[in-house]
């Protein structure tokens, strides 16, 4: 008669034998990727992270890490770079500046894209055009200009 220890050992050996024969379902291909983060690549499979994306302004792809949600995200432009759409920017904010070009700009504290506004001294036609939100006519026949807010309550008053 075999003791409980021998019975348990025989059961474990039987399970190991059955497991190796069954192969635990379909066999997966071994990941033969060898490239680390930052190395040039052509396909996702070449990278240890399984993530090969455009990672700069240069038209080449590099192995990049996945996000915490296991997604491969393409490189996006930092603030100050020219853009034509919000999706091109890290901040998701592509805003027109004083020339006809648009630039990636940071989001506000409230995660909004703040449009470019004219600096003090520039000509304007409405308060919304000015960084100070203050567009007034300094003299009766002078053009409207952006001016800084003044006074204790920072009101839009002529200087």
Curated annotation (Swiss-Prot):
Write down the superkingdom of origin. Answer: Eukaryota
Query: Which organism was this protein described from?
Result: Homo sapiens
Q: Which keywords label this protein?
A: Glycoprotein, Signal
Identify the gene encoding this protein.
LRCOL1
Q: Where is the signal peptide?
A: 1-22
Q: Which GO terms describe its molecular function?
A: enzyme activator activity
GO terms under cellular component: extracellular region
Q: Does the keyword Electron transport apply?
A: no
Q: Which residues are glycosylated?
A: 31
Name of the protein in its database record: Leucine-rich colipase-like protein 1
Record-linked Pfam families: Colipase-like
Enumerate the Gene Ontology biological process terms.
digestion; lipid catabolic process
- State the InterPro entries in the record: Colipase (IPR001981)
Cite the Gene3D superfamilies for this sequence: 4.10.40.50
């Amino acid at each position: 008669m075999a003791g409980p220890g021998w019975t348990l050992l025989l059961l474990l050996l039987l399970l190991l034998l059955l497991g190796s024969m069954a192969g635990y379902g379909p066999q997966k291909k071994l990941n033969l990727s060898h490239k680390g983060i930052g190395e040039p690549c052509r396909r996702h499979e070449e990278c240890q992270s399984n993530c090969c994306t455009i990672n700069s302004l240069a038209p080449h792809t590099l192995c990049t890490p996945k996000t915490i949600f296991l997604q491969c995200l393409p490189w996006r432009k930092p603030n100050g770079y020219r853009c034509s759409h919000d999706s091109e920017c890290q901040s998701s904010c592509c805003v027109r500046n004083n020339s006809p070009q648009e630039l990636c700009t940071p989001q506000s504290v409230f995660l909004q894209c703040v449009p470019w506004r004219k600096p003090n001294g520039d000509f304007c036609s409405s308060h919304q055009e000015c960084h100070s939100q203050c567009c007034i006519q300094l003299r009766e026949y002078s053009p409207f200009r952006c001016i800084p807010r003044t006074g204790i309550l920072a009101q839009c008053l002529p200087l």
